[in-house]
Amino acid sequence: MDKKKKIKEISTTFTLTTFEINEIEKQKKYYENSRSVSIEALKIVQKKRGWVCDQAIIEIANILNLNPSEVESVATFYSQIYRQPVGRNVIRYCDSVVCYLTGYEKIKKFLEDYLFIKIGNTTVDGRFTLLPVCCLGNCDKAPTIMINEDLYSHLNPDLIPNLLELYK
């Protein structure tokens, strides 16, 4: 089987689960318009699958009677919607001006060296993905990182190895 045919088969066999469809339908009653529902729909799909593939964008658009490009624009606007597979744990480091002034570059460099990955990549074992975010809203406690939903403040490179051990 050639590669193009295999990709086409994968994309045409994707379907949202009944649970995902029902959850998206439930969200419709809480919002004025379909575009507003799209962020919730994206979160529903991502929660189950870990990321949102192209075919999921199309299916969400169909459910919400939107153009797929409208759903895609919402998905790419929000940094916490993943459009490609990520590791079991996502590390977001804040690269805002305040974090820059308080030393985020040392944190970033340490994470890259310690995990043997560059920004936007995932460790070989699939344990961590490293992503920048423009602000974590914790400027008075900078530099800051977020691992999954957990926020860590006043960081320095010496604290990071023990912190990462919490996320197996």
UniProtKB/Swiss-Prot annotation:
Keyword entries, A-Z: 2Fe-2S, Iron, Iron-sulfur, Metal-binding, NAD, Quinone, Translocase
InterPro entries in the cross-refs: NuoE-like (IPR002023), NuoE_dom (IPR042128), NuoE_N (IPR041921), Thioredoxin-like_sf (IPR036249)
PROSITE patterns: COMPLEX1_24K
Superkingdom, natural source: Bacteria
Catalysed transformations (reactions): a quinone + NADH + 5 H(+)(in) = a quinol + NAD(+) + 4 H(+)(out)
Molecular function terms, GO-annotated: 2 iron, 2 sulfur cluster binding; metal ion binding; NADH dehydrogenase activity; quinone binding
Record has ATP-binding as a keyword: no
SUPFAM superfamilies: Thioredoxin-like
Binding site for [2Fe-2S] cluster: C94, C99, C135, C139
Record-annotated disulphide pairs: none
EC number, as in UniProt: 7.1.1.-
Co-factor note (free text): Binds 1 [2Fe-2S] cluster.
Names of required cofactors: [2Fe-2S] cluster
Entry keyword annotation includes 4Fe-4S: no
Subunit structure: Composed of 13 different subunits. Subunits NuoCD, E, F, and G constitute the peripheral sector of the complex.
Family as reported in the entry's similarity comment: Belongs to the complex I 24 kDa subunit family.
Chain's role: NDH-1 shuttles electrons from NADH, via FMN and iron-sulfur (Fe-S) centers, to quinones in the respiratory chain. Couples the redox reaction to proton translocation (for every two electrons transferred, four hydrogen ions are translocated across the cytoplasmic membrane), and thus conserves the redox energy in a proton gradient.
Name used for this protein in its record: NADH-quinone oxidoreductase subunit E
Organism name: Buchnera aphidicola subsp. Schizaphis graminum (strain Sg)
Lineage: Bacteria, Pseudomonadati, Pseudomonadota, Gammaproteobacteria, Enterobacterales
